[in-house]
Every structure is written in C-alpha cells, then in structure tokens.
Amino acid sequence: MGLSTAYSPVGSHLAPAPLGHRRSAQLHRPRRALLATVRCSVDAAKQVQDGVATAEAPATRKDCFGVFCTTYDLKAEDKTKSWKKLVNIAVSGAAGMISNHLLFKLASGEVFGQDQPIALKLLGSERSFQALEGVAMELEDSLYPLLREVSIGIDPYEVFEDVDWALLIGAKPRGPGMERAALLDINGQIFADQGKALNAVASKNVKVLVVGNPCNTNALICLKNAPDIPAKNFHALTRLDENRAKCQLALKAGVFYDKVSNVTIWGNHSTTQVPDFLNAKIDGRPVKEVIKDTKWLEEEFTITVQKRGGALIQKWGRSSAASTAVSIADAIKSLVTPTPEGDWFSTGVYTTGNPYGIAEDIVFSMPCRSKGDGDYELATDVSMDDFLWERIKKSEAELLAEKKCVAHLTGEGNAYCDVPEDTMLPGEV
C-alpha cells in the first residue's frame, strides 16, 4: 500500500468549459494554475510487510510532503479493512475563516462518520495559494487517520474532478457603497463558472452546498449552469438561521435547545427569512402552547433571529465563522444520517414541484427530511396560517426579484434588477 504526495505547479489556459463536455476540462484551466496534492493511496504493489512503516529515499521522492513521504501497509489495520469507499469533498474559499473551522471537523470523522475516509480538495485563488499550503500543513500535522488525501488548487476544473460533495464557501464580500445588484452580479459570475466546472468534471450525483452570499440566488445560478446534475442536489445554507432560532426558543422557554424540534426557516437567507414558530415544538409540544407570549413570537423572536449576526459583530468585531462552520457540518449530517422520526431540518432547495404553493424555479428554504442517503424529501405535514404565509410570500417576492437580476447568468435573457429594499444580513455589508 502506498502513501504518496505530489506537489506540482502546472501551467494552463483560462477558458470556460462547454456544458455537457465532461472530460474536456483539461483544455479549460486558468492561466498559471497551481495544483498541489497530498494523497494517501492504496497501491498493492508497494505494500510493506508486517505493517512496518518505511521512508523512501529522498532522491526518489523530491515532491513529497512531510509525513506523506512515508509508506504504510494500511491493510494491516483492522479498522481500515472496514472503511467505506473514499468520499471526495471539494471546498471553495478554503483559506478563509469558515473553512479553517470546517475542514478539521470534516477530517476528524465528525461529519461523515468514523468509518468514512475522505479526500479534501481545496479551492482558492492565486492570492490565497500560500495560505492554502498553510492549511494543508495544519491538516498534515493533525494526523487524522480518515484523511486520505489533500489537494489544493485555483482551477475548479481540476479541484472539482470526481467530487462527491462541493461546499462552495468562497465569495466576494460586499464592499462599502456596493449595491446589492452589483454583489449579485459579481458573485453570480463566480457561481456560474463553478457550476460549469461541476457539470464538466464532478460526479454526476454530486451534492452541492452553497454558502457564499447571496446563497439562495447563487445556488440557483450554480444549478442552472450545471444541467447534467440534478437540480435537487443543490442546497443553500440556512442551517445557521435554524440553529439561531432554536437557541432563541430554548432561551424563552427555559429549556436546553435539544428539546426544540421542527424549526423551519422559510425563504431567503436575508432579513426576509421567516423563522417558523407555528410548526416548531418544544419537548414535543407546539411552541405556542409552551410560549404563550404571541407578541414576542411574532415580533422579537423573528427580529432577534434575523439580526443575530449583527449582534455578534458588535461583540466580536467580525462576522460569524465558527458557528457557520458548525451549521455547515449540521447541514451535511442531516443529509447523511436519517432524520429523527417526526422532525425535519431547514435547507434552501429548488422549489419546482413543491407542495406548498411557493413559486417554482427559485431556491427557497423549506422543511426537509432525509433517509441518510444524501437525498431528501420535503415535509408535507406542516401547517400554515395567514401570518406565516404573508411573510413567506414576501421572501418569495424578494427571490423572484433577485432571479431577474441574474437572468444573464441563468440563460434567461437580459437582467433587470429591481430589488425594492436592502435586506442583506448584517455582516454581509
């Protein structure tokens, strides 16, 4: 069994890959692309007898990376024999603060399980490439047994090749004075390009979680540029909003938050989001039976959830990173482990065919359940009242307006941007 590493700058050319041409990506790479790989691979021809580790001569392994220069017989380990097939996970924005928390959760087995080996494929930019090398070094020094491969690069057509999961965190932050329409266009270009790359080289059943904001519309752009991947496989992260809502309900009810279930965030990841207390439960009872303060539920609860990020910035001096990473891990775990009986989770998904009457062809956060196979179904046993529906329609209108802003990126003609008010969440300005 071989344990190897490659660290090789490569040159290539910048051009978008045509849709539907999966293996043409070799000709469509950014100029001066960089790719480095730290890999643990099975090589029966190089197995070491008796499980003894041996180092290869430096002269024959000039490109190796630290501990990955050493070879091991991994078949000598009983737990290795029972491991599942390796899962390839791409992470964009991999040199950022969110990724700095997330990657170690992934590598530890906390997210996919203690019998699931993984390969991490980290996407950055020329500007962040040295930082990516530092991230790879920290992962190396952490000695995670399930982490079998680490590669870093700036070309999505290389980094996304054969990935089973794509966690798209990287996006341009909103600068001072930048209109929301401009942010939609700038980040939309990023996610259009990444959608094309996923369509060209990723696994055709890849699961895609969009974190970079505005995440709902970015997810829509991404899926529209990846027609060979099921639209159902694309998600926009609203799990942090759900986690915040659970915390506030638990605080008000005087219980620990593990007693709170069936919390839904409906709509956009913006201040039009709708934390649903009508269907939520505390210790199995409807929230409205436990918390009888209707005014608090309708006003303070919703506003507190929407503005939690801003409150954190005031205290901490920067936007949330660790809690966002936790929510990404939670979102993945909700798809790879069966949903507890009677419960559900929130995620932004494609609305076409939804049972609620929400406009089709947008990405909208809704309640979902999973059997633990990476797929999901929409929960149907939900209640609606006028208060909830009115707010859902407001968030729907916002997403329809955003969709018009990016029509040039989704193949639907010329863009027309008329977002009536600025609803970006605190920390995104």
Swiss-Prot record:
Residues involved in NADP(+) binding: G93, A94, A95, G96, M97, I98, S99, N187, Q194, V211, G212, N213
Location within or outside the cell: Plastid, Chloroplast
Transit peptide: 1-40
GO cellular component: chloroplast
Ways its activity is controlled: Chloroplast NADP-MDH is activated upon illumination. In order to be enzymatically active, disulfide bridges on the protein must be reduced by thioredoxin which receives electrons from ferredoxin and the electron transport system of photosynthesis.
Chain residues that bind substrate: R174, R180, N213, R244
Keywords: Chloroplast, Disulfide bond, NADP, Oxidoreductase, Plastid, Transit peptide
The enzyme's E.C. designation: 1.1.1.82
Family: Belongs to the LDH/MDH superfamily. MDH type 2 family.
Protein name, per record: Malate dehydrogenase [NADP] 1, chloroplastic
Organism listed in the record: Sorghum bicolor
